[in-house]
């Protein structure tokens, strides 16, 4: 083909362990992918850090590979999606980070968030949609300001910049000309008022964070600046946190549309439209904003362990040699033989939020084989997804009729069929599974007029396979009731027998 006549969008997907760059054409086909891993640093127990320079280098290597077969002049837009919450502070003049990036998994700031939880829980939840937790950026910023020499003084003089990874990459790509983020990433800092769409002064004062270090918050699709890094000026016109980008990439543009991403853990997001519904057991977050001072919201449920349970079955039990062996093994038995597996290795996330829960396999008899356990592991992913979706439907007052899926385990036909069966709704798997990158490519393309409407994007998006429920209501109820009983037995276990949380 004559690629010179083609227009391309470059999506930078900066994850927790690797930086990726994916090149899309104007029909949203993947043209090329570059991926480079970078290390995580663990200076002390509970500390998880990245070197921002290593992220930048890996990202640029990934870009180089992704665009190796085309002329960079054909790239009409760049979009950036990122691991959310991870925090970088850097010197405004030199651009040099003042400390390593503190990663979303880092728990060092628990004392700060315990204090917030005890004294300001309702205020923070009402304003930000989030619960006080080390996961979010706010306490990480405070820790760097309080613990790294001279940083607070420099911040108060306006000499320090803060950003989540999207902001840091945009700053680097534009040679320091743009210090911006989008609504979706801002909503994960625990400093952004999701009702007023502005940085919240009350929370900033509480944590003694100067507002001058924060980026300007813009819609998820507009030109933020121009990158010179590829040899010619290319507009950076899309920005969204990874899970929100995946929701957009699944063309979940309407209220009640929902997606599940199955990775090491799973993230389920439901589009709830223009009003930030308050939730007891889930997070309320900004999905995206396509216009200034207007946002679409989502309910989010995070499940800590899904794909990681397959890794444990492979590496911990050595029951299989490679992860792909679990599906044929699980398919070799007709059902789970009464076995349930609750993967509470690090407690349970949404909707239980029990840090004291521990993993459990129950229902074992003399006839149980490793195939039954394999099946129970796969089924646990589907049960946990139903747990979250039931709460979403109840709290949003929305009944859903289909679930869009992506991520590694979504390739597993047995699991996807069981997911449809246990939910009693259709499960839809898209042709392009790189929904995070595709979502931000869509946002970037919209930002420069490559596509002109959401309808146009919906028409480009293609289905790979639909899984239709075939299980009887009676069987569905019985299986799910067994799961709920198993979860009850797993909850609070570390409190009963002791052991570290």
Curated annotation (Swiss-Prot):
It comes from the Archaea. ATP binds at residues 16-18, 264, 307, 311, 408. One of its GO terms (biological process) is glycerol catabolic process. It catalyses: glycerol + ATP = sn-glycerol 3-phosphate + ADP + H(+). Keywords: ATP-binding, Glycerol metabolism, Kinase, Nucleotide-binding, Transferase. SUPFAM superfamilies: Actin-like ATPase domain. GO terms for molecular function: ATP binding; glycerol kinase activity. Sn-glycerol 3-phosphate binds at residues 16, 84-85, 135, 242. Its EC number is 2.7.1.30. ADP binds at residues 16, 20, 264, 307, 408. Key enzyme in the regulation of glycerol uptake and metabolism. Catalyzes the phosphorylation of glycerol to yield sn-glycerol 3-phosphate. PANTHER family: GLYCEROL KINASE, SUGAR KINASE. This is Glycerol kinase. The gene is glpK.
